[in-house]
Amino acid sequence: MNVQTMILTLQEYWSKQNCILLQAYDTEKGAGTMSPYTMLRTIGPEPWNVAYVEPSRRPADGRYGENPNRLYQHHQFQVIMKPSPTNIQELYLDSLRALGINPLEHDIRFVEDNWENPSLGCAGLGWEVWLDGMEITQFTYFQQVGGLEANPVSAEITYGLERLASYIQDKENVFDLEWVEGFTYGDIFTQPEYEHSKYTFEVSDSAMLFELFSTYEKEADRALEENLVFPAYDYVLKCSHTFNLLDARGAISVTERTGYIGRVRNLARKCAKKYYEEREKLGFPMLKNKEADHEQA
């Protein structure tokens, strides 16, 4: 099964579980969790089931396209179910079956790995899912989002697409993966991997990036003053990515690092609080949609 078919299979499976299928969010981010589809929508009481592929940029992991397993950008398939269904683990195992992986024929383990994202003020109970000794998925029950208590609890399933595809295709080098017939992962991503790595480690202008961080930070606050949560959160993501570029460049000292993470976290918490307030003003409209569905049933 090639990567494209794998993605289509997961999309079809989760759409049948009443998930909205969305497209990748168009701002740089380090993980699918950072998308507003997860970070903001898991706040408050409104139901939310969603699935999407998220390209995730980790500048420090760039290896010029020469390392078989380390990438500047990898891909996650993200699933959020809010509130978490009681059978969420079985739903996940069924998704593996849809991919041709029979849990009864493989060693599948849920290894405790509680999750935390300090820069977003998020935390939860979690497990790594290991398939025959390789981690393929992170499974998390959100307890805190943007510093706010998660109520109801959302379940997050994050598949590492490259790792899962490497297992399914039995490839040791990610660049050898078949994306679709006639095109490998390397055909598509080797050049951007090299160029982004070169930019990150050799070309990026640290002084300019420091200025950008401060500019994005101010603009996030300015948007929040106007109760514009989504534009503000876009600038939080830009702050986070800019910080990651500076960190990868070695431009931030150990003592400065904590301060910069704190600044991003402070903005994320402001966005979380403002998102809740704005949805509350609207009367949590998706909650009403759910109630209407129950009445029709």
UniProtKB/Swiss-Prot annotation:
Lineage top rank: taxon: Bacteria
Organism taxonomic ancestry: Bacteria, Bacillati, Bacillota, Bacilli, Bacillales
One family name in Pfam for this protein: tRNA-synt_2e
Cell compartments where the protein resides: Cytoplasm
InterPro entries on file: aa-tRNA-synth_II/BPL/LPL, Gly-tRNA-synth_heterodimer, Gly-tRNA_ligase_asu
Catalyzed chemical reaction(s): tRNA(Gly) + glycine + ATP = glycyl-tRNA(Gly) + AMP + diphosphate
HAMAP family to which the protein is assigned, alphabetical: Gly_tRNA_synth_alpha
GO terms, biological process: glycyl-tRNA aminoacylation
GO MF annotations in UniProt: ATP binding; catalytic activity, acting on a protein; glycine-tRNA ligase activity; transferase activity
Family according to the record: Belongs to the class-II aminoacyl-tRNA synthetase family.
Subunit structure as annotated in this protein's UniProt entry: Tetramer of two alpha and two beta subunits.
Protein name (record): Glycine--tRNA ligase alpha subunit
Main localisation: cytoplasm
PROSITE patterns attached to this UniProt entry: AA_TRNA_LIGASE_II_GLYAB
EC number: 6.1.1.14
Any one GO cellular component localisation term in the record: cytosol
Keyword terms of this UniProt record: Aminoacyl-tRNA synthetase, ATP-binding, Cytoplasm, Ligase, Nucleotide-binding, Protein biosynthesis
NCBIfam families: glyQ (TIGR00388), PRK09348.1 (NF006827)
Source organism of the structure: Halalkalibacterium halodurans (strain ATCC BAA-125 / DSM 18197 / FERM 7344 / JCM 9153 / C-125) (Bacillus halodurans)
